[in-house]
Amino acid sequence: MSGRGKQGGKARAKSKSRSSRAGLQFPVGRIHRLLRKGNYAERIGAGAPVYLAAVLEYLTAEILELAGNASRDNKKTRIIPRHLQLAIRNDEELNKLLGGVTIAQGGVLPNIQAVLLPKKTESHHHKAQSK
């Protein structure tokens, strides 16, 4: 008989995404496409989008971890831009990396200059000694 139909021949293996091969959540294929379309270079190696996806995933996980801690500290269950701002600005390395970035609805870090604080006076202790 002819070789038509579903019988015969090897069954084609289920396709596996490059993200799952690399053990990543971020889309390797999409990043590869964006690198090609972005005119960053004439050619893009096969490992470049995997590496970039891994770096982006790591940074995202790091920021979300710190923002989750900030939301828990504020007794909230949902991460809001304020929590992202607090997470980034309180971390030295992330603050340096994202120094020129403005986060909408993020607010500012609470900070009062030392010279503006009321002076510590020894009034109670000093008056008791002088009597």
Swiss-Prot record:
In-chain residues carrying the UniProt-annotated modification N-acetylserine: S2
N6-(beta-hydroxybutyryl)lysine modified-residue sites: K10, K14, K37, K96, K119
Main location: nucleus
Transmembrane segments: none
Signal peptide positions (record): none
N6-(2-hydroxyisobutyryl)lysine PTM positions: K6, K10, K37, K75, K76, K96, K119
Source organism superkingdom: Eukaryota
Role summary: Core component of nucleosome. Nucleosomes wrap and compact DNA into chromatin, limiting DNA accessibility to the cellular machineries which require DNA as a template. Histones thereby play a central role in transcription regulation, DNA repair, DNA replication and chromosomal stability. DNA accessibility is regulated via a complex set of post-translational modifications of histones, also called histone code, and nucleosome remodeling.
Family: Belongs to the histone H2A family.
Protein name listed in UniProt: Histone H2A type 1-A
Taxonomic source organism: Homo sapiens (Human)
Gene: H2AC1
